[in-house]
């Protein structure tokens, strides 16, 4: 009898041990980006709209500059479009954890480090997404900012961030608008200077 009970207990414990923990796509996504912390990569414009003509053919660099368990800062540098014709270091993508998912915000600065009128806009995830792709519909705070600054065309923005084994892609979409830049993880480059104001 004791042997039978011991065997039954062993079977029960084995069954418990074999049950895998449920995976969280957003945790996996966050970890995948964090794995690149401190590294910078070359990129390019991947979309083809007239609104982005000034960026076409320009050198681009993304830098996973700072990572904590709840926040990742990714400056986005573009050559040839700065105020002096050099590098524009005005943009930083900030991804943070929230109680309900992930949040993407855009920190925009002027060359003197002061904040742009249009800064800290973005949105929160509305679903779990996948380990390689998260989308961020515009939030109420950003809609208010866009409306106040005469940019209500952006009130339906949806941003996306993708990270795969080979690349990182940032995107913006809304009706009539498609903007994408992609960076090759196989082309690491020297980390650039700090973004303006940081």
Regions found by a protein language model. Name each.
Residues 93-145:
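An exposed acidic His-Trp-rich patch
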Residues 65-106:
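Mid-chain, structured segments of secreted extracytoplasmic proteins
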Residues 42-69:
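Short, solvent-exposed loop/hinge segments that bridge or flank secondary-structure elements
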Residues 119-124, 165-198:
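Edge beta-strand at a domain terminus
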Residues 133-175:
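Helix-rich interaction surfaces within compact, conserved domain-sized segments
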Residues 25-51:
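Tryptophan-anchored aromatic micro-motifs
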Residues 59-65, 91-96, 121-123, 156-161, ...:
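Hydrophobic/aromatic beta-strand elements that line small-molecule binding cavities or substrate pockets
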């Amino acid at each position: 009898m004791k042997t039978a009970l011991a065997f039954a207990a062993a079977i029960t414990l084995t069954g418990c041990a074999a049950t895998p923990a449920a995976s969280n796509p957003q945790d996996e996504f966050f970890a995948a980006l964090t794995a690149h912390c401190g590294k910078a990569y070359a990129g390019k414009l991947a979309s083809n709209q007239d609104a982005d003509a000034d960026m076409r053919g320009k050198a681009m660099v993304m830098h996973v500059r700072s990572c904590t368990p709840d926040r990742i800062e990714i400056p986005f540098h573009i050559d040839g479009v700065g105020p002096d014709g050099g590098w524009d270091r005005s943009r930083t993508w900030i991804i943070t954890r929230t109680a309900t998912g992930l949040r993407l915000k855009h920190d925009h600065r002027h060359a003197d480090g002061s904040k742009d009128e249009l800064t800290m806009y973005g949105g929160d995830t509305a679903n779990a997404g996948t380990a390689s792709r998260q989308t961020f519909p515009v939030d109420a705070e950003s809609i208010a900012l866009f409306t106040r600054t005469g940019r209500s065309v952006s009130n339906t923005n949806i941003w996306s961030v993708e990270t795969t084994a080979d690349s990182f892609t940032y995107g913006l979409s809304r009706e009539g608008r498609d903007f994408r830049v992609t960076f090759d993880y196989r082309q690491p480059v020297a980390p650039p200077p700090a973004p303006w104001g940081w």
